[in-house]
From Swiss-Prot:
Residues 207-220, 330-347, 421-439, 572-585 have a biased composition (Polar residues). This is Transcription activator MSS11. It comes from Saccharomyces cerevisiae (strain YJM789) (Baker's yeast). It comes from the Eukaryota. It is found in: Cytoplasm; Nucleus. Residues 646-655 have a biased composition (Basic residues). Belongs to the MSS11 family. The gene is MSS11. Residues 51-83 form the LisH domain. Keywords: Activator, Cytoplasm, Nucleus, Transcription, Transcription regulation. The keyword Magnesium does not apply. The keyword Cytoplasm applies. Its main location: cytoplasm. InterPro entries: LisH. Interacts with FLO8, STE12 and TEC1.
């Protein structure tokens, strides 16, 4: 046995003689203890004072249990084992050995009664197992060192559990995203969990889906799709896999890319060829793309011609009337009336632009191309999107559309009109020189007719004479719309919601015959049908319209009557009407208003004329509108009765202003008397709005005849000097004030 080092004294042991009896001389050179005959000594882990003694006790127990006698005797003589002694007394008290025994072994040869037959001490362990605690403890440390944490019980009951393996190996150079960090190994890409990728070592089989495109080592992607065989693989030609980006959307570039794709796809499927043909194949790819380009271009041209011929056979061109289409001369057309069906040779007009164009555009372009090749038609350019780049072609196309619609409308009721039965004589006799002039004149007439339809409003009413509409030529679209709406109101046309039927013979009675119905601001109700008047209506008062503002570019383009503003008779009444009453209409004023129109058309501003007009106040129509907040708080609907007089000149002398005031006072007295005769209350409020005085201040006078308001809450406004339709340019802010 080899020389061993003494654990306690670090001395070399030269004794190699092992016998059944222990040595007489101890190796620890400590004082030999004298034991009693009744005492017994044994090795126990319960007496261990530190971890080293605990380990030694379990090692000694392992050697004895497995019959390693020589090793156990040598270990007992050298190691510091925890010893314990049991007295032979009846009490069985356990006593520990002397402190000197803790430092080394003792010579117990002279005490043969206390040792076993083999000269070894017995062991009594508190922590013990079938295979000794030391063996199980060692197996646990071995499993920890090897990374095998599962015991036999777990392996038997969890056979489907996968082993824990590291996700990122130490030799991996790939940049794996963060969302792959917690996935199981079967979900992770193979390159993330395998050896690093390099140009020479990795060639994926199949479609090449098991490599990372973002990997910096995988730069040449085109080589990944090519199989490295003995004679087929060519590294220089693999650069043609990606198309040239400088070509952009050119057809040649796309064809070149598709040629290379087909070539490489065939190389992938082709078997390996011997090395002798490798030199020939290196020279072939330089000639092959040009040859395939020519073949594919020829095939595409043939397909385009076939598609055009099929479209011409399925949808033949209709017969074209040269009068309808001025830009197609009849002498160049076919004898049967059909346009020449010659497939265009120019590649600008191909099958791609046909799908995005109308049939009329296709005909026009084919006509242009056909005559352009013959040198008869003017040249034009067409973009790839199929749109018109020539303004003349655009104008002619819209002229064709407008003329076709106009001719169809004119010949709709003519049964003898048959466009498909034209003969050669008719085409020859048709003049072709004035086609453009006729087309322009027809187009102008068509536009003029549309414009006249917008201006004219049909006045189809019973017992009403039509009045010539004014010619409005130099107004804007907004002014024309306002003019149309005012004419529609004047013509009493039917509303869109059909709430008021067009009955023109029903006219409302006078004001004193109808009581006022509170709570409804709608049109008046005609309760007594016997009181309806059937007087024929007079001239339309809304015809003579002039713009309110002299500046056309003003924000408000309103229209107002020139002199007098008349409304239908219904607005004179104070009665209300339900919403769904079929008897309520908007008739025109009576014939008795003609006198007022004749009087108001005079431009004389004499006081005598004003007096004459004011004396006929019974026939003067009034405007009834809801009152403002200054009126009384009665439950009835208050009205503002406004009597409109002709416009008066602004610059008047002092003497004339005094006379006009006297005349105004006389008019008020006359009005109050007439209101008393008609049955209304004599208490009437008069509001005078006078122009500025010589001092430059405007005055507003309010006079109360008896300081009482009328029963119906109406005011009589004297507007001799206050013309609401001729106050000039004003803004909405002034209107609010």
């Amino acid at each position: 046995m080899d020389n061993t080092t003494n654990i306690n004294t670090n001395e070399r042991s030269s004794n190699t003689d092992f016998s059944s009896a222990p040595n007489i001389k101890g190796l620890n050179s400590h004082t030999q203890l004298q034991f009693d005959a009744d005492s017994r000594v044994f090795v126990s882990d319960a007496m261990a004072k530190n971890s080293k003694q605990l380990l030694y006790a379990h090692i000694y127990n392992y050697l004895i249990k497995n019959n390693y006698w020589n090793s156990a005797a040598k270990f007992l003589s050298e190691a510091d084992l925890p010893l314990s002694r049991i007295n032979g007394s009846a009490s069985g008290e356990k006593t520990s050995l002397n402190a000197s025994l803790k430092q080394g072994l003792m010579d117990i040869a002279s005490k043969g009664g206390i040792v076993s037959e083999d000269g070894l001490l017995p062991s009594k362990m508190l922590m013990d197992a079938n295979d000794t605690f030391l063996l199980e403890w060692w197996e646990i440390f071995q499993s920890l060192f090897n990374g095998d944490l599962e015991s036999g019980y777990q392996q038997d009951h969890n056979p489907l559990r996968e082993r824990i393996i590291p996700i990122l190996p130490a030799n991996s150079k790939s940049n794996m995203p963060s969302h792959f960090s917690n996935l199981p190994p079967n979900v992770i890409p193979p390159t993330q969990n395998s050896f690093p990728v390099s140009e020479e070592s990795f060639r994926p089989n199949g479609d090449g889906s098991n490599f990372n495109l973002n990997d910096p080592t995988n730069r040449n992607v085109s080589e990944r799709f090519l199989s490295r065989t003995s004679g087929v693989y060519d590294k220089q030609n693999s650069a043609n896999f990606t198309p040239d980006t400088a070509i952009n959307s050119d057809i040649a570039g796309q064809q070149y890319a598709t040629i290379n794709l087909h070539k490489h796809f065939n190389d992938l499927q082709s078997p390996a060829q011997p090395q002798q043909s490798s030199q020939q194949q290196i020279q072939q790819p330089q000639r092959q793309p040009q040859h395939q380009q020519q073949q594919q271009q020829q095939q595409q041209q043939q397909q385009q011609q076939q598609q055009q011929q099929q479209q011409q056979q399925q949808t033949p061109y209709p017969i074209v009337n040269p009068q309808m289409v001025p830009h197609i001369p009849s002498e160049n057309s076919h004898s049967t009336g059909l346009m020449p069906s010659v497939p265009p040779t120019n590649q600008q007009f191909n099958a791609q632009t046909q799908s995005s164009m109308f049939s009329d555009q296709q005909r026009f372009f084919q006509y242009q191309l056909h005559h352009q090749n013959q040198g008869q038609a003017p040249s034009f350019q067409q973009s790839q999107s199929g749109r018109f780049d020539d303004m003349n072609a655009m104008k002619m196309f819209f002229q064709q559309q407008a003329l076709q619609q106009n001719s169809l409308q004119q010949n709709l009721g003519n049964q003898n009109y048959q466009s498909n039965t034209r003969n050669n004589t008719a085409e020859e006799t048709t003049p072709t020189n004035d086609n453009n002039a006729n087309g322009n004149s027809l187009l102008q007439e068509h536009i003029r007719a549309r414009f006249n339809k917008m201006k004219t409003i049909p006045q189809q009413m019973k017992n009403q004479n039509t009045v010539a509409n004014p010619v409005v030529s130099d107004i804007t679209s907004q002014q024309q719309y306002m003019h149309m709406m005012m004419q529609r109101m004047a013509a009493n046309q039917q509303l869109q919601n059909s709430a008021f039927p067009p009955d023109t013979n029903r006219i409302a009675p006078a004001n004193n015959a109808m009581p006022l119905q509170p709570g409804n601001m709608g049109p008046p109700v005609i309760e007594n049908p016997g009181m309806r008047q059937t007087n024929p209506s007079g001239q339309n008062p809304m015809i003579n319209m002039q713009p309110l503002y002299q500046n056309v570019s003003s924000a408000m383009h309103a229209f107002a009557p020139q002199q007098q503003f008349h409304l239908p008779q219904h607005y004179k009444t104070n009665t209300s009407v339900p919403q769904n009453d079929s008897t309520s209409v908007f008739p025109l004023p009576n014939n008795n208003n003609n006198n007022n129109n004749n009087n108001n058309n005079n431009n004389n501003s004499n006081n005598s004329n004003n007096n004459n007009n004011n004396n006929n106040s019974n026939n003067t129509p009034t405007v009834s509108q809801p009152s403002s907040k200054r009126t009384s708080s009665s439950s009835t609907t208050p009205n503002i009765t406004t009597t409109i007089q002709p416009k008066r000149k602004q610059r008047v002398g002092k003497t004339k202003t005094k006379e006009s005031r006297k005349v105004a006072a006389a008019q008020k007295v006359m009005k109050s008397k007439k209101l008393e005769q008609n049955g209304d209350s004599a208490a009437t409020n008069f509001i005078n709005v006078t122009p500025k005085d010589s001092g430059g201040k405007g005055t507003v006078k309010v006079q109360n005849s008896n300081s009482q308001q009328q029963l119906n809450g109406s005011f009589s406004m004297d507007t001799e000097t206050f013309d609401i339709f001729n106050i000039g340019d004003f803004s909405p802010d002034l209107m609010d004030s």
